[in-house]
């Protein structure tokens, strides 16, 4: 989703506790985001891996910049 002119996407899995925490953080900050569940979308998982060479979740993409894992400091700087 576009937020203040940029897009926020959270790539997550069903069992990832840190993914839930990142989504809660963004919601608490009033940021709209789209979510891609990689468990339900294996093609997107493969596409993301080929693009980033990263197999860790969550991955939060903000205006083309990636935040890997639960890194609230980096998220705060980008939103």
Residue ranges of each PLM-predicted region?
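Local sequence-structure signature of Cys/Sec-based thiol-disulfide redox active-site neighborhoods
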Residues: 2-31
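Thiol-based oxidoreductase modules, predominantly thioredoxin-like and allied folds used
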Residues: 33-44
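Hydrophobic alpha-helical segments typical of transmembrane helices
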Residues: 44, 71-74
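Major-groove DNA-recognition helix of helix-turn-helix-type DNA-binding domains
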Residues: 50-52
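A short, hydrophobic beta-strand/beta-hairpin element that forms part of a small beta-sheet core
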Residues: 58-67
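Short hydrophobic/aromatic patches at helix-to-coil boundaries
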Residues: 75-79
């Amino acid at each position: 989703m576009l937020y203040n002119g940029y897009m926020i996407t959270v790539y997550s899995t069903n069992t990832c506790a840190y993914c839930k925490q990142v989504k809660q953080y963004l919601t608490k900050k009033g940021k709209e985001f789209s979510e891609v569940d990689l468990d339900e979308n294996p093609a997107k998982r493969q596409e993301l891996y080929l693009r980033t060479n990263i197999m860790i979740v969550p991955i939060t993409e903000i205006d083309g910049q990636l935040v890997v894992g639960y890194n609230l400091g980096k998220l705060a700087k980008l939103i």
